[in-house]
Every structure is written in structure tokens, then in C-alpha cells.
């Protein structure tokens, strides 16, 4: 759209010809008051996924065995600060994003629109190296086998 000197830009409230809108095309939804007279608001689900619960579960798993000599009070638990949790959360998001991007690139090279478990496995081998990749692939394969067990043939 080209504007000539002296011509006004179209705004949200007006049309291009300069006419004013009189009524909205969609009706407004009114909220019904609750018993206390307050309006009930819906909770919006956040778009951000947090892995903090899973990180806490991992911390419980790696707690060292209790030794009577070193620890007189009993169970010793690891804790994590909120900043460290934020770092771990962004780390997990970054790794998932890299794996998804690499796997989608592999599927596009094969001219497929569906991601297969093999694509994810190859992407993990590319992104993670060495022993970490071996453990990640092994854990992934056990999860896939647990989710989708092969049927016994009779």
C-alpha cells in the first residue's frame, strides 16, 4: 500500500475508506457471576513446559547411599536452587529442540512427513556423542519397547 502526502493511514478502528465501524461482528461473551458475586475467570494454560518435577525425581534417584560414619542424621537429600533449575530446564528444552530439528531434517531428506523412532535414534547419535549417546539410545529403545510391545506370534 502506498501512501500519498496528506493521506491518513488506516487504523484498527477504521476501514481504508475512512468510514467508522459501528458494531462489532462478533458478540461479546459475558461472564456469569458466582455465588459471591465475583466473576469467574478461566485459567490460561501456559505454553511453557517445565521439567522441574522430572529433575527432582532424578535428584532423588542419584542420592548417595547413607553411610553411618559420614551422615549421623539419616537420609541426605540433594537440593537444587531455582536458578540451577532454570538452567537445567533450558538445557533440556535445548536438547529436545536440537534432536527434533535434526530428526525432522533427516525425515525431509528421505522425503517423508512422518518421524520414525529410527530418525530420533540417528538424531541422538549425531547430537550426543560417545557413551552418552549409547545410554540415551538404550533408554529410548526400552521406552519404545515398553510403550509398543511386539505381539507374540502363535
Curated annotation (Swiss-Prot):
Residues 1-11 have a biased composition (Basic residues). The keyword DNA-binding applies. Residues 12-27 have a biased composition (Polar residues). InterPro entries: Histone-fold, Histone_H2A/H2B/H3, Histone_H2B. GO terms for biological process: response to mercury ion. Keywords: Chromosome, DNA-binding, Nucleosome core, Nucleus. It is found in: Nucleus; Chromosome. CDD domains: HFD_H2B. Core component of nucleosome which plays a central role in DNA double strand break (DSB) repair. Nucleosomes wrap and compact DNA into chromatin, limiting DNA accessibility to the cellular machineries which require DNA as a template. Histones thereby play a central role in transcription regulation, DNA repair, DNA replication and chromosomal stability. DNA accessibility is regulated via a complex set of post-translational modifications of histones, also called histone code, and nucleosome remodeling. This is Histone H2B.v3. It comes from Dictyostelium discoideum.
Amino acid at each position: 500500500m502506498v501512501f500519498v502526502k496528506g493521506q491518513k493511514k488506516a487504523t484498527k478502528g477504521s476501514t481504508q475508506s475512512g468510514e467508522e465501524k459501528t458494531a462489532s461482528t462478533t458478540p461479546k461473551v459475558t461472564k456469569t457471576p458466582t455465588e459471591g458475586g465475583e466473576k469467574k475467570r478461566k485459567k490460561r494454560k501456559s505454553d511453557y513446559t517445565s521439567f522441574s518435577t522430572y529433575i527432582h525425581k532424578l535428584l532423588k534417584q542419584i542420592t548417595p547411599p547413607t553411610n553411618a560414619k559420614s551422615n549421623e542424621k539419616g537420609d541426605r537429600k540433594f537440593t537444587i536452587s531455582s536458578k540451577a533449575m532454570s538452567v537445567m530446564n533450558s538445557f533440556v528444552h535445548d536438547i529436545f529442540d536440537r534432536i527434533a530439528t535434526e530428526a525432522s531434517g533427516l525425515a525431509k531428506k528421505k522425503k517423508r512427513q512422518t518421524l520414525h523412532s529410527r530418525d530420533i535414534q540417528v538424531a541422538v547419535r549425531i547430537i550426543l556423542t560417545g557413551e552418552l549417546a549409547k545410554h540415551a539410545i538404550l533408554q529410548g529403545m526400552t521406552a519404545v519397547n515398553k510403550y509398543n510391545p511386539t505381539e507374540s506370534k502363535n
